[in-house]
Amino acid sequence: MIDPLASPGSAPLIVIAGPTASGKSALALRVARRFNGVVINADSMQVYRDLRILSARPSVEDEAAAPHALYGVLDGAEVCSVGRWLALADGAVAAARAAGRLPILCGGTGLYLKAALEGLASVPEVAPEVRAEARELLAALGPAALHAKLAELDRAMAERLRPSDAQRIARAYEVVRGTGRSLMDWWSDPVATPALPGRPLLLVIDPPRAAQRAACDARLLAMVAAGALDELALLLARRLDPALPVMRAVGVPELARTLRGEVGLAEAVERAQGATRRYAKRQGTWIRTQLRPDRVLSESLVTQLSESQLTDIDNFLYAFLLTGAS
């Protein structure tokens, strides 16, 4: 069905987006098996080898059922910026097409998805000493205080960021200090890195709130049962910089407290469940307001869709692949 000789600009690209625990991976796997596809990760935590369980990466069985790419490819000591991910994704899409397979992006990291569909503005390299200053201030003062400093230099950007969002606060601070321009100004410049080549079809999963919250709670319990605490103990033993993305993944700070003996397991799990629900809510809001889907699946979680509903999705995709109509 996928012509490896087709022009990259006209070749189909399926994008499946949605909040955590909504069933994205299950749908992507189904599409990959039915349409000879490769599932390509668009989740900023699932790129790390250290977090198979806590990032809800596809299981070994799922990875054996269909090809997957960009899952567990980076060490936790690294940072996977949007630009770096976009370059990796571009290579993965090209490799899928060269093999005659359908590339299927799957994830909930909004900035990754937006870059894939719209491209990425160019932000110049910040001088190492300015970057070091931002990291030192973050370590010494904490994210909330650095957020206040950012507001003095770039109020508009500060208003977009939560005071606890350490990584993005430090990035915004170093850009405005190093370039004299807000990161928002750089984003508004003409695109320097193009979107992923192809004819995209965007499916968004937007399940009912109650079902989403229940799925988040159940997933966290399943992670703990599957060995999340053992996985986390290995990560903490590495003594990585607490500001690294892998150390701030949803569930990591909350469950780490029980490993340090600060709270009991039940309280840590409850806190991690709450963090997961809040994260899913933010993801859903961002996706609804920032992306332009070709189809929204809002009836239920993917895992609760009937076979007839799933078949309808298959037919929708089949029509797109044959004609380009959505």
Swiss-Prot record:
Gene3D superfamilies: 1.10.20.140, P-loop containing nucleotide triphosphate hydrolases. Coiled coil: none annotated. Residues 43-46, 167-171 are annotated as: Interaction with substrate tRNA. The keyword Ribonucleoprotein does not apply. ATP binds at G18, P19, T20, A21, S22, G23, K24, S25. Disulfide bonds: none annotated. Monomer. This is tRNA dimethylallyltransferase. It comes from Rhodospirillum rubrum (strain ATCC 11170 / ATH 1.1.1 / DSM 467 / LMG 4362 / NCIMB 8255 / S1).
